[in-house]
Amino acid sequence: MGVLSDARIIEKIYDESIIISPFIYDHVQPASVDLTLGKKIKIPNRIENAVNVYDEQQEIYEEREIEQYTLKPNDFIIAFVRETIQLPASISGFVKNRSSLARVGLDVSASSYVNPGYHGQMTITIKNMNPNSVVIHSGMRICQLILVDVEPEANIDYSKKEDAKYQEEKGGEVAKLYLDREFQEYNRLKDKGSISNFFEQRLRDNEKSIDDILSDEQKRNLGLK
């Protein structure tokens, strides 16, 4: 598994096995591609109660369209990259903060990983770690995408997963933990009890060896039999 160089990135974009649109040639670095900040952001509102990670999060955020935005110290926002990205089953990606932005105290993250088969406008989070306010601008280069070979290619890439919560996202998506498979199972129970106890029991019930999980055909396809 190797990181794609600028030459291989250009090659993959040329043959359309990777799509980055709009594509700016000057944004290709020696082993990454710079991505730019979109116009819409979501700002968390202060609420009385603690945020439950399994609640729907839409009402917590105020959506705003920006040309520029001032992040005060410790401010946190959800944003998205302007580019639409599509990766094949043979390539995954890592999103990293730009060094220049880190030096002014901005922490930019996209949960750092992009699955093979992903398609959409990536959501990113931005936090100001600077003791001073920092101004950001739509269209500025906000993060870098590092592309990596997946060998052999993913058997079930992100586009084929039934629970791919962020496939085809249009940017600025809030957390969708309430769609996690295990939480959906918990919600279907008549006698729910403690969610932590349910998760612990589920882990015990589903713990199996890889030999028990794979069918003979799957083992043959993976070269294990």
List the predicted regions and their residue ranges:
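DUTPase catalytic domain/fold
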Residues: 1-225
